[in-house]
């Protein structure tokens, strides 16, 4: 658990050497959180789409450590959307699954497709199989299509595959595949590399990279087989995407993994559908006050409360070279999010440019502690403008171009000065001037 989620009793750390028993997930607490998250998602979608009040398919990004802290709230949400609940033994272990009857559920069963992280794949194979089992249970129910969207999709896909000559049993198994991720032993989502190397032209490039990295299916007897057709079919019906945040210790603008996994899913769905799905963030950082916001609202909240907060910036400035790198990493993350999901409006881009790159005092500080960080900030801002991710004012672009030329001169002067270069960390490009974190490679998601 996390101390910030009402679990102060876990402190001091170092006494407990396991997080939780995977066989107890989702826990009763996690179930209650998941049900509330699902209800809020459905209410939000219905309010935004009165002509089509129920989404056909919900795409859920599922990470490992958040589910350890929340007791499997993501899995609970997935099960509840499908109209299935866990059955617990008196010991707290989950012993099975139970169909929620239509009269109790009070709504259609929603199709759900989780995109799991590699840590989740490796740490919770029992939960992967649980979701897969729930899908097949719901697909087998003799219910009308309007009451059971998952079954309707499965039957349509089986008919399409058998018409192409695929064996009916094989077709049915493939039609019920819903859990997707990286290949066995693989990590990442394919998008971050393109953003960092600028090896992309449009959102479709990012979407295709995500599909290529994420089309490996998992379930009972299915261990990462390539199912691009099945993953694409889920994306085509994906009216809503969601990633839940269980803590405020970090957020969607904290590192590149967030846009890599979740922004990439939005880009992939947009590429296949031809229009963006509704994208949401479930906030259960305070389990007593769960909230759901659109991804754009969440990004705006974080930009205004943290990224543009003078107190936060001043706090990082106290850390000199490393603080400058962390400020620089903000731009790596912003361009990734806006390229994949269009979550940053032009006014906020302008404010970031003015605060981070064009403020004379900030420029002088960067030159003193880490000119490479400022170089990266301006480079990312210009890249965003040139790709029309940010429709920048021409005067702002001109200022950024002048700053870019000026900081390049500063870096050359420092690098060429033998009296400075050997004795300062500013004299040569750092290994990671942006100072960003890759939680996926660290095995933390």
Segments the model singles out, each with a brief description of its role:
Residues 1-445:
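Ligand/cofactor-recognition surfaces for anionic moieties
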